[in-house]
Design a protein with these regions (language model features):
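Acidic/His- and Gly-rich active-site-bordering loop/insert found
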Residues: 7-91
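Alpha-helical metal-binding/catalytic segments enriched in His/Glu/Asp
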Residues: 81, 93-127
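Acidic, glycine-rich active-site loops and adjacent beta-strand->loop/helix elements
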Residues: 85-87, 124-132
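Short acidic, glycine/serine/threonine-rich loops at helix termini
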Residues: 92-94, 132-139
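A glycine-rich helix N-cap at a beta->alpha junction
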Residues: 141-160
């Protein structure tokens, strides 16, 4: 195979982005999909469906981050690619979703071409990456990277507008 043959399906990638951008419409063509709200749950379910259709095994960690794993030839640490599906209160249409869905398109392209990688690939959707609901931003990725302790992260105060919810009860 030449490098010219290793090409993503741009139409499929665009259609996937546009389908996800229909969930949580905001103002001026943007999105409003705050972490762990109904619209976030809806796009997460769609992402999970797409990943499973691509042959990935989807797991969710204690912070609610999603990991869609495509196995490799060897049992090695995975290559992670992704971003987030949540948005700011008035978020951009492509912020975050492009990183997550580009990872999914990589997996789909490898599948289309019958390529098995040496290492597993995991497409990640980090929970609360934007930090619009729970401070600080990137708290779930921070727990994963060892920057924050899990108990500390789960004890983050809930914003006033969501006083009936807490991060631990939402993640469960």
């Amino acid at each position: 195979m030449t490098t010219n043959q290793l090409q993503a399906n741009g139409d499929r990638f665009w259609d996937t982005i546009e389908a996800s951008a229909q969930i949580g419409p905001g103002v001026a063509g943007g999105l409003r999909r705050l972490a762990l709200t109904d619209s976030d749950a809806e796009v997460r379910a769609l992402f999970r469906q797409w990943c499973e259709e691509a042959g990935c095994t989807v797991t969710i960690d204690q912070m609610g981050s999603m990991f869609a794993r495509r196995d490799g030839r060897e049992d090695l640490p995975p290559v992670l690619v992704g971003s987030h599906l949540d948005t700011q209160i008035a978020g951009g249409r492509y912020d975050g979703i492009v990183g997550v869905l580009a990872g999914l398109e990589i997996v789909r392209t490898l599948n289309d071409l019958g390529i098995t990688t040496k290492r597993p690939i995991e497409v990640v959707n980090w929970t609360n990456e934007e930090g619009a609901r729970f401070q600080p931003p990137m708290v779930a990725a921070g727990v994963f990277a060892g920057v924050y302790e899990l108990d500390w992260a789960l004890a983050r105060p809930t914003p006033v507008s969501y006083t009936h919810l807490t991060l631990p009860t939402i993640v469960r």
